[in-house]
Amino acid sequence: MTSTKLIAILIASMFSLFSNHVIAENHKIDMLNKLGKERMIYSKKVISINVNDEITWKSVDKGHNVEFIGLPEGASKYKSKISKEAKYTFSKSGIYLYQCTPHKAMGMIGLVIVGDDKSNLDKIKKVRVYGKSKKILKSLLKGL
């Protein structure tokens, strides 16, 4: 193997490793008591991201958290502490349904679609939600 070919292979390998780290993004979602006319709400109800992207949920107003209640096969369950910033890196593609545990009946839910994979949509539709979350989830899923 010539030194030129070896250098080209090394550069291509380094670029490949570097580009995987550059592509991952950190998305921000605020946990709020009020946004416009809506109460007990995440600043984004639905977000589409890539595999290995991270979401940071910021507790702008106290008393909120993030709890996954529906997720793709093989994904890790997650529940953050109340009133604390939450971070999660999404390594599995699919739909994630999450809620604010204290405000689940008030409709404080959200969806993350990872990798444009909706293969677990039927599973998400079967997740039991309460109160106002029933109507909101139905509306969010209709929009997918």
Language-model regions, residue ranges each:
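Extracytoplasmic copper-binding redox domains, predominantly the cupredoxin/blue-copper superfamily
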Residues: 22-144
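Hydrophobic helical h-region of N-terminal Sec-dependent signal peptides
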Residues: 9-15
